UniProtKB/Swiss-Prot annotation:
Catalytic reaction annotation: N(6)-[(R)-S(8)-aminomethyldihydrolipoyl]-L-lysyl-[protein] + (6S)-5,6,7,8-tetrahydrofolate = N(6)-[(R)-dihydrolipoyl]-L-lysyl-[protein] + (6R)-5,10-methylene-5,6,7,8-tetrahydrofolate + NH4(+)
One record GO biological process: glycine decarboxylation via glycine cleavage system
Protein name: Aminomethyltransferase
The species this protein was found in: Listeria innocua serovar 6a (strain ATCC BAA-680 / CLIP 11262)
Domain of life: Bacteria
Keywords for the protein's UniProt record, in alphabetical order: Aminotransferase, Transferase
Length: 362
């Protein structure tokens, strides 16, 4: 049996009561105090996540921008220095290699933050598709990453840094910011639907920053609440809403797919064809009318005909309803369309609803 990978924060988990699980080969906390309490802490106050398992890939060199334009679906030329951008890396088929965030440090330096379980695959794909004068480095082991999320995130973080946090706009970042005596990159971003920050530092310093933030009375949050939070906000999870067989257009991520950008990118022609032909399946939000919780891979039916599959589902702690995302035949994606979800040998009534399920008050 392969030993599970551990983040630099791992030695501190037991101290804070973490219950860990195998998540894509990593030993990570699924919960601390409990999923519902943690979820509520992030929605109403603030919570701290150890996300040091995420991958960081550095791209440097004079042709960095044109290389990333070829590799990624969004328009890299639109990113200003000190800003980040959500992106999709596609196969020639239009299917998804990964979804990721690109940070622009300078005209010739970028950091790509990728999903942990995809880090090696992404790195190999990037090296295989190098064009021009660039170097690509998998620097994941050098970074620790924490996410402080929730309406009080700025107020709490400002106690530990002199950096002007209010000046950081959404998807903006600052470098060399001192947090609890540690040099960090602070980005206004996250995966919860709340305001918040993602903080990057050298892996050796991650534990110090983690404990300094928790000392401000912040709750540590596990993967369970991370999943319910992102699902309410309808933020895609690779392996569920996206995969090598699911294109970003099917997943409703058109905002990150710039088919009109001049640069040709890997998968562009396949995505243009798919758009012109019309999508045969689409991701929708569903809410159960009858009792039951939809889960990943449960089938979706209409009058005994299987029309799709649940990609993610949960009992929503914020709304108190049972919700899910489903990839279904486009013909049945109208709001209020009634469907059935196959939950253990039983068909349970559901309907198509507006997404996101949750949107924070600005």
């Amino acid at each position: 049996m392969t030993e599970l990978l551990k983040t630099p924060i791992h030695p501190l988990y037991a101290k804070y009561g973490a219950k860990t699980i195998d998540f894509g080969g990593w030993d990570l906390p699924v919960q601390f105090a409990g999923i519902k309490a943690e979820h509520e802490a992030v929605r109403t106050d603030a919570g701290l996540f150890d996300v040091s398992h995420m991958g960081e890939i550095l791209v440097e060199g004079p042709d960095s921008t044109s290389y990333l334009q070829y590799l990624l679906s969004n328009d890299i030329e639109k990113i200003k220095i000190g800003k980040a951008q959500y992106n999709i890396m596609c196969y020639e088929t239009g299917g998804t290699v990964d979804d990721l965030v690109v940070y622009k440090k300078s005209e010739t330096e970028y950091i790509l933050v990728v999903n942990a379980a995809n880090t090696e695959k992404d790195y190999e794909w990037m090296v295989q598709n190098i064009v021009g004068d660039v170097t690509v480095k998998n620097a994941s082991s050098e970074f620790g990453q924490l996410a402080l999320q929730g309406p009080n995130a700025e107020k709490i973080l400002s106690k530990l840094t002199d950096a002007d946090l209010s000046s950081i706009s959404f998807f903006g970042f600052i470098e060399d910011a001192d947090v609890a005596g540690v040099k960090t990159i602070i980005s206004r971003s996250g995966y919860t639907g709340e305001d918040g920050f993602e903080i990057y530092m050298q892996s050796a310093d991650a534990g110090k920053v983690f404990e300094a933030i928790l000392a401000e009375g912040v709750a540590p949050i596990g993967l369970g609440a991370r999943d319910t939070l992102r699902l309410e906000a309808v933020l895609a999870l690779y392996g569920q809403e996206l995969s090598k067989d699911i294109t970003p257009l099917e997943a409703g991520l058109n905002f990150a797919v710039k088919l009109k950008k001049e640069a040709d990118f890997i998968g562009k022609q396949a995505l243009i064809k798919q758009k012109e032909a019309g999508l045969t399946r689409k991701l929708v939000g569903i809410e159960l009318i009858e009792r039951g919780i939809p889960r990943h891979d449960y089938p979706v039916f209409l009058n005994d005909k299987e029309i799709g599959v649940i990609t993610s589902g949960t009992q929503s702690p914020t709304l108190g309803t049972n919700i899910g995302l489903a990839l279904i035949d486009t013909a049945y994606t109208e709001l209020d369309q009634e469907l059935e979800v196959g939950i253990r040998n039983k068909k349970v009534k559901a309907k198509v609803v507006q997404t996101p399920f949750y949107k924070r008050a600005k």
